[in-house]
Each structure stands twice: as structure tokens, then as C-alpha cells.
Swiss-Prot record:
Belongs to the LDH2/MDH2 oxidoreductase family. DlgD subfamily. NCBIfam families: PRK13260.1 (NF009750). It comes from the Bacteria. It is found in: Cytoplasm. Catalyzes the reduction of 2,3-diketo-L-gulonate in the presence of NADH, to form 3-keto-L-gulonate. Keywords: Cytoplasm, NAD, Oxidoreductase. The keyword Acetylation does not apply. The keyword Hydrolase does not apply. The lineage of its organism: Bacteria, Pseudomonadati, Pseudomonadota, Gammaproteobacteria, Enterobacterales. The active site is at H44 (proton donor). It comes from Klebsiella oxytoca. Homodimer. This is 2,3-diketo-L-gulonate reductase. GO terms for cellular component: cytoplasm.
Length: 332
């Protein structure tokens, strides 16, 4: 089915107000969920909203909480999220990293006791729109087996890197081949994954999203490389924030809350003039996109460049929402 941005936001806002979230907070949170969905990231927008409300009802998310600064060390700050609403707090933390970068050329905010930030790409994009390089990542509950193991002991720990090119170039990727949210999107659409995304119950690689959702044997991105990167991202976020690691979140909490996150902004214009920056970025993009195509009908793409097109299409034609997901939200 198709809905408008206004219908989405109104539905989210109603549920949040019914959950006794303060009006101003509910409006800001509903706006972010609707913007994420409008951008085409359904897995961490409309599809994730019922799970968000479940955690709100369970007390994992404390809607009235506000993040508190703990430590300042020049361009680095350490904050405690106090288990506040994840997407609203993440936006504030990237804003703070940008402020630090304006003073120091680079800003780093390490956040502990945080909640799921929904679409991580929103915060990298936020920095790039203002002319900064944006880098951020989060750890998570253990939902992936390290390479060579069967048990989930590492997080998907998504990493975002956004570059202020025209259009913005951005990588937004979990350390698994697919996030669990994207497994759900493909399952709801009745689609196989385009490439292997995990293991079946017999330990064979599979493209069947429902199987991977059930057995939790998701495939690390790049096999052992994604497994290793997940581990070091967790270590850095834990140390810089003095927060919880994947092990602590998994073993000590009843659900995924109290995670650790990193937000970095770099002011490129302190290092290179605007004209030179634009020329260098354009040369990189042209060099890549003019490569001979493997399939003459499929263009060579740069990461993140499709988001502007998706946003325009959804604004023009309406936002596609799975019927069963919309029914869940209406029933909340």
C-alpha cells in the first residue's frame, strides 16, 4: 500500500502520545521515523517502529531522559545517553561532533548507555549536508556468530561513512551481509536474497531470509573480514565511551539497550579549499562511473547516490508500506 509522509508521521505520533511520550518529544521522534521511511530505509523506519514501541513499553527506552556530558578532552567528548530515545540522541551527538569539528577541525563524541539509533546513515548524512565528513558506528547485542563459530557472540555493529560530495557519497553498512531488518524486508516481499546472506540449519550458505531470521546464523560481511571488523569496532566504542561491550549488553541486559556509539565529524574545508575539494571528488566519481559495465543495462553506482532518487520517488508517488506492518502500527 501507499501512504504519504503526513500519514506516516501522524500514525507514529498518535502511538507515541498514547505511550505517554511528551508532545514535543513525540513529534520529533515521529518526524525522524517518517523521514527514514520516506528515504526508502523501511527496515529501520516503519518496519522497526513496533519493536521500538515494545522496548518503550518494557522500560528499555526512557523517553524523558536526556544525554549528559561526562568528560571533555579537547576535540573528544564522552557522553552518557541515560537510555534516552536512540534516534533523537544520535542526532544531538552528531550535532555536537560537528560543533567540536568547527573548533578543532575534528570532533569525536563517544556515547554510552544508548539505545538503537534506527537508521545510522541519517547521522552521517547530517554531517555531509553541512560539508563535513561524517563517520559513526554502534555496537549491539550479539546477533552474529564470529567466523568459525555457531553461537552469536558478536554484533552487526553498523558503520557509516559519509562524504560531502555532490551528491553525497555514503556507505551505511552492518558487519553482516544483510541486517536483520533487510532480511525482514526481503521475506515480507517474498524475495530471495540477491547473494548468500547466512547459513541454513545444516551449515550451508543460503539466500533464504526467513531461514536466517529463525536460526540467527547471519553471514559476516566478507566472511572473516566482517567478523574481525565487528570485533574491533566494538572494542573502540567500548573503550572510548567507557560503556558496555557486545558481551556486556548480551549477558547483562534483558534486551538490546545500553549500547555504545561513536560519532566523528571532520571539517574538510580546514584542510582543502572548496574548488579543489569539488574537483578531486568529481574526478574520483567520474573515474569510477565511466568504467566499462559488466552489464550494459546496469549503471556503475556510487554508494548512497540512490537515496536522492528514492526520496524524490516517494515524495512524488507515495511511500510503500507493507500491509501487515501498517496493520501492526494501526493496532498499537
Amino acid at each position: 500500500m501507499k501512504v504519504t509522509f503526513e500519514q506516516l508521521k501522524e500514525a507514529f505520533n498518535r502511538v507515541l502520545l498514547d505511550a505517554c511520550v511528551a508532545r514535543e518529544t513525540a513529534d520529533a521522534c515521529a518526524e525522524m521515523f517518517a523521514r527514514t521511511t520516506e528515504s526508502g530505509v523501511y527496515s529501520h523506519g516503519v518496519n522497526r517502529f513496533p519493536r521500538f514501541i515494545q522496548q518503550l513499553d518494557n522500560g528499555d527506552i526512557i523517553p524523558e531522559a536526556q544525554p549528559q556530558r561526562v568528560t571533555t578532552l579537547g576535540a573528544i567528548e564522552q557522553w552518557d545517553a541515560q537510555r534516552s530515545i536512540g534516534n533523537l540522541t544520535a542526532k544531538k551527538m552528531m550535532d555536537r561532533a560537528i560543533e567540536l569539528a568547527s573548533d578543532h577541525g575534528i570532533g569525536l563524541v563517544a556515547l554510552r548507555n544508548a539505545n538503537h539509533w534506527m537508521r545510522g546513515g541519517s547521522y552521517g548524512w547530517q554531517a555531509a549536508e553541512k560539508g563535513y565528513i561524517g563517520i559513526c558506528w554502534t555496537n549491539s547485542i550479539a546477533v552474529m556468530a564470529p567466523w568459525g563459530a555457531k553461537e552469536c557472540r558478536i554484533g552487526t555493529n553498523p558503520l557509516i561513512v559519509a562524504i560531502p560530495s555532490t551528491p553525497i557519497t555514503m556507505v551505511d553498512m552492518s558487519m553482516s551481509m544483510f541486517s536483520y531488518g533487510m532480511l525482514e524486508v526481503n521475506r515480507l516481499a517474498g524475495r530471495e536474497l540477491p547473494v548468500d546472506g547466512g547459513f541454513d540449519d545444516d551449515g550451508r550458505l543460503t539466500k533464504e531470509p526467513g531461514t536466517i531470521e529463525k536460526n540467527r546464523r547471519i553471514l559476516p560481511m566478507g566472511y572473516w573480514k566482517g567478523s574481525g571488523l565487528s570485533i574491533v569496532l566494538d572494542m573502540i566504542a567500548t573503550l572510548l565511551s567507557n560503556g558496555s561491550s557486545v558481551a556486556e549488553v548480551t549477558q547483562e541486559n534483558s534486551d538490546e539497550y545500553g549500547v555504545s556509539q561513536i560519532f566523528i565529524a571532520i571539517e574538510v574545508d580546514k584542510l582543502i579549499d572548496g574548488a579543489t575539494r569539488d574537483a578531486k571528488l568529481q574526478r574520483i566519481m567520474d573515474f569510477i562511473t565511466t568504467a566499462e559495465r559488466a552489464d550494459e543495462n546496469v549503471a556503475v553506482r556510487l554508494p548512497g547516490h540512490e537515496f536522492t532518487r528514492l526520496l524524490d520517488e516517494n515524495r512524488r508517488n507515495g511511500i510503500t508500506v507493507d500491509d501487515s506492518v501498517w496493520a501492526k502500527i494501526q493496532a498499537l
